[in-house]
Amino acid sequence: MVTIVYASQGGSSKRYAEWLSERLDAPCLPIGSVPDGIDDDIVFIGWRSGPAIVGLGEITCRDRVIAVICVGLERYDEKAMETIRRKNSVENLFYVRGAMDRRCLRFGQKLLLGIVSVKMRLFDRSPEDKEVRRVMDRGGDLSSEDQLDPFVSWFGNR
């Protein structure tokens, strides 16, 4: 049996957990509700903050985690994923794009995003960078259930 565990601040990780729960017919729990000594395999869904996956370190039964789904704004980047995989000691890592609701951010997070946005405005000019900057500045949603397809395929073949 598998349980989906998520850490969510703005709602994207929770939405992906609920979509995955329906597709796998598996329960999903917020990170604070995982019982000690859980016997199920765990699929963890958390959001990216730099190279960290928020909430992953809070799982006390880390040996039960069979895969991690990382939620972020940027397009998939293999080099960044390799860094995240290494820094978080995750073998089976998947990536999906999420949403940003600026109302859910703390002051420090808004400040940091403002700095990143200015840097992107000055140095990054690709259409993808402009899309991410727009979502960072105004909020927006890049999530879709079909982004879970690579994970679902992997899960069915393991």
Predicted features along the sequence, with ranges:
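Residue-level signal for well-ordered alpha-helical segments
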Residues: 1, 36, 70, 125-128, ...
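N-terminal beta1-alpha1-beta2 submodule of the flavodoxin-like/Rossmannoid cofactor-binding fold
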Residues: 1-62, 149, 153-158
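Generic alpha-helical propensity signal that fires on short helical segments
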Residues: 20-22, 60-62, 84-86, 111-114, ...
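Helix-loop-strand module that forms the ligand-binding subsite of alpha/beta enzymes
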Residues: 32-108
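Glycine-rich phosphate/pyrophosphate-binding loop and the adjoining helix
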Residues: 112-158
